[in-house]
Amino acid sequence: MNRRKFLTISSGVAIAKFPFHSTIVSHHALESGQASSPRTERRPVLVRAGFTRRASGSEEPTTSQQTVVRSLDSEGRLAVFVVPVGEHEPYRGAPLHVHHEQDEWIHIVAGEFVAEVGGKRFRLKPGDSLLMPMKIPHRWSIAGQPHCGAIHLYTPAGLMDISWDPSPNDNIRQTPEQRKAEFEKYGMTLLGIPLTREEIELTV
């Protein structure tokens, strides 16, 4: 599933669905040497505009989010995603969650986003960037302007590149228990809901 497809929970608040399916080497395996033995030859990874990189290493056209660096490209060091500049639904974003092993970084290319890290909120504008460290609860959302774009980076990569891939369960509404279990399976804990429209608009 595309990470920017959103579900609406019973409270009426839209949340980003994080899809996951385990086809990638874990960070623990990388640390233990399982993923780098034998060591593969490193090579440049070029992803053209309008294309996304799949787990197989192939590329395919996309009109939505792009995976441009996968865990296997960087020996697990990082994963990079692009929300291409275009029209996206405002007031949508990630629920409150915490990564146990990944730092998350966002750079704003166009439009505005609002992020909350450790209870402190930031309005991010073009050219701004924000590090959301591991083990600190955070959430982010597109602000009121539909025209926006951003770059997301996770280090180490963990399973985050899989979270951006399409999934057969994209359109299946999950129970809160299923959502929490999904987050835990991939090294995160789901803590709460996304930023509300009022919270976004009050952040300056």
Describe these PLM feature segments:
Residues 58-96, 102:
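A short glycine-rich, His/Asp/Glu-containing loop-to-beta-strand
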Residues 119-134:
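Short acidic-glycine-tyrosine-enriched beta hairpin
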Residues 139, 143-204:
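Double-stranded beta-helix
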Residues 101-113:
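Glycine- and acidic-residue-biased ligand/ion/polar-headgroup-sensing regions
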Residues 2-27:
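N-terminal export signals
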Residues 20-58, 204:
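C-terminal segment of N-terminal export signals and the immediately downstream linker at the start
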